[in-house]
Design a protein with these regions (language model features):
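Short, surface-exposed amphipathic charged segments that create phosphate/polyanion-binding patches used
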Residues: 33-39, 101-106, 173-176
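A glycosyltransferase accessory/donor-loop signature
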Residues: 13-15, 21-24, 118-220
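N-terminal anchoring/stem segment of glycosyltransferases
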Residues: 1-47, 54-57, 197-220
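Short, solvent-exposed polar/charged micro-motifs at secondary-structure junctions
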Residues: 28-34, 98-101, 166-171
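Short alpha-helical segments and helix-capping/turn motifs at coil-helix boundaries
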Residues: 6-7, 48-49, 103-104, 165-167
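Conserved catalytic core of nucleotide-sugar-dependent glycosyltransferases
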Residues: 80-144
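GT-A fold catalytic core of metal-dependent nucleotide-sugar glycosyltransferases
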Residues: 47-96, 120
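Short secondary-structure capping/junction motifs at helix and strand boundaries
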Residues: 16-17, 61-64, 69-70, 127-131
Length: 220
């Protein structure tokens, strides 16, 4: 899923993108991350909050879960940065009915669920500079994901089209149209997942482009 997500970002972008994956083993080896994996739904459940530290608290950064698929140029999203805000995200009113999600993990219910699944992070904001290694490794999931470390006025809003929760937002219910799909209820390979074919089409296109590059390299 990570590869398809990255491909979709680059496919639509007119500019070069600096994309890095949060790899938990590497972060642990550098002694930046030491939380036990117990009760985490993914390996990046908490590592996303290391981004300001990794950026040396400079500039802006964007985070998204790896089960995203971008349908438009992310430059449009990045243009929504606002230096008066610490974090900018889609403020979902999302309360899933399912008790179990992907990989048989418990579907934890908490306020502001999925707000942190896509974030524009102002790494230079004073409150963001408080997000240090101790906070990321020791504070509760609710504290981090509900942005309890921020004042409400420091959290900016994004259109939900950029974090379109598949099977939650619906074009046929007047929710508009997606700019970025988020397969939050499970991977896009799940049988009843809306937009499954869209994801598979991007995967196929990625594989075709990769094969074309390999063929070109061999022919030289």
């Amino acid at each position: 899923a990570s590869k398809v997500c990255e491909f979709s970002l680059r496919h639509h972008s007119k500019e070069d993108l600096d994309i890095s994956l949060l790899k938990t083993p590497a972060l642990k080896k550098k002694k930046l991350y030491w939380r036990p994996y117990k009760n985490q739904s993914t390996q990046f459940t908490y590592t996303r909050f290391l981004i300001p530290y990794l950026q040396k608290y400079k500039g802006w950064a964007m985070y998204c879960d790896n089960d995203f698929l971008f349908l438009n140029d992310v430059k449009e999203l990045l243009s929504l940065q606002n230096n008066s805000k610490a974090v900018i995200c889609v403020k979902h009113e999302y309360k899933p009915k399912e008790k179990i999600k992907m990989d048989n993990k418990k579907q934890t219910q908490f306020e502001r669920k999925n707000w942190s699944s896509l974030m524009l992070i102002n790494c230079e904001h004073p409150d963001v500079k408080d997000v240090d290694l101790s906070m990321v490794n020791e504070e509760s999931g609710e504290y981090l994901h509900q942005f309890d470390w921020l004042n409400d006025e420091d959290i900016g809003s994004l259109p939900h089209s950029w974090n379109w929760l598949v099977n939650w937002y619906r074009t046929d219910k007047g929710d508009g149209h997606p700019d970025a799909l988020h397969f939050t209820e499970g991977g896009p390979w799940i049988a009843d997942s809306e937009y499954k074919q869209t994801w598979l089409n991007y995967k196929k296109l990625m594989e075709e482009e990769n094969e074309s590059k390999r063929t070109t390299t061999i022919s030289r």
